[in-house]
Every structure is written in structure tokens, then in C-alpha cells.
């Protein structure tokens, strides 16, 4: 395996670990949240995350 390939693999593993730690669902619309008490909070970009309270 080349150096750049190993680096890319390591990066993918880091991203996978980071996303698995974040238990919030990624959403685009309120209806995508499994919990009816949660809102789809848009985080400055096009998608958001399901949270009970949206912080500014």
C-alpha cells in the first residue's frame, strides 16, 4: 500500500469514529427526526442534526 493510500484510509477511520460518537441524526427536514420531540437544527450548512433544543 502506498503512503497516500494509507493516509486516506486513516482519515476515513477517523471520520467514521467521529461520526459514530455523534449520536445526533443528520437531517434536512423536521420530519426526518425519529423523535417527534426533536427538531432539525440546521448547522450553518445545508444539513442539520436532530436535537431537543436548537442552540444559536
Swiss-Prot record:
A GO-annotated cellular component: extracellular region
Organism listed in the record: Californiconus californicus
Signal peptide: 1-23
UniProt keyword list: Disulfide bond, Knottin, Neurotoxin, Secreted, Signal, Toxin
Chain segments annotated as transmembrane: none
Name of the protein described by the UniProt record: Conotoxin Cal6.41c
Domains: entry comment: The cysteine framework is VI/VII (C-C-CC-C-C). The presence of a 'disulfide through disulfide knot' structurally defines this protein as a knottin.
S-S bonds: 27-41, 33-50, 40-54
Tissue specificity statement from the Swiss-Prot or TrEMBL entry: Expressed by the venom duct.
Subcellular compartments: Secreted
Key word Signal present: yes
Function in brief: Probable neurotoxin.
